[in-house]
């Protein structure tokens, strides 16, 4: 076990495991994004409560289309992408849009929430984000007239912006 010298005494330091995750990841205590400054801080790093939801700060990560899903299922890319934000301490992360039907995706590579098989990978992402002290929200939608097309970089002249 690692030991360190603190005020002339040996102190054992143990890295605690984050709960509710099927693999080891250290718990962040206090969570990343917590202000250590004892002087009055701006509201950005203060808690915010919205009904029954309490967020550790007011830093939110907005949704970003990744065009990296397979048959509407989020992949390890999504876990890495969203998890990298979670480890840096925002109060809330919003996933990219998850389509309500296969035809409602912008492209075949968009995430969906219309099949039970899509829930497992999403659950893994949620568990990891929570293990880092952040909250996560899902953006649900239908692409409307832009639905069932290709990713923007494959056909720029026919992409509706």
Task: Tell where the protein language model's regions lie, with residue ranges.
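Flavin-dependent oxidoreductase catalytic cores
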Residues: 1-161
